[in-house]
Every structure is written in structure tokens, then in C-alpha cells.
A protein has these predicted regions:
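Short, Lys/Arg-enriched anionic-surface-contact patches
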Residues: 5-26
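Long, charge-rich, low-complexity alpha-helical segments
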Residues: 27-65
Length: 65
């Protein structure tokens, strides 16, 4: 398992090694897609049981990689 910056992890045994929010099985690309589709940060956080900070970290990670 790789613990990447910003609370993002990559583990081959979780979601086939896709980057996920640390401590969850929520893929970064899913979070980014929801925000890109117009869903609010608050609604995404509530839907996936993650924090708003997790969402901003996922967006930052996606923009950097």
C-alpha cells in the first residue's frame, strides 16, 4: 500500500489499486466526477461519508497527477 500525500492511498487490494480517500473505498475519480458534474462539495461529502477536506484533497491530488 502506498500512502500518498493528502490522505490519498493506493492499495492493490482496494479498488484494483485506484487512488482512494484514505480509510475508505471511495475512489478519487468518483469524487472528482461528482464535483465536475455540478454536485456541491457538501452533497458529495454527505453521499460518500467523507469530509469536505477529503474532497478538496482528492481534487488537488487529481489536478497534480
Amino acid at each position: 500500500m502506498f500512502d500518498l500525500s493528502l490522505g490519498i492511498t493506493v492499495d492493490p487490494s482496494v479498488r484494483f489499486g485506484k487512488p482512494v480517500i484514505k480509510g475508505t473505498r471511495v475512489p478519487v475519480d468518483t469524487v472528482v466526477a461528482r464535483v465536475a458534474s455540478g454536485m456541491s462539495i457538501k452533497d458529495v461529502a454527505e453521499e460518500y461519508g467523507i469530509t469536505e477536506k477529503d474532497i478538496y484533497n482528492a481534487l488537488h491530488y487529481a489536478a497534480s497527477n
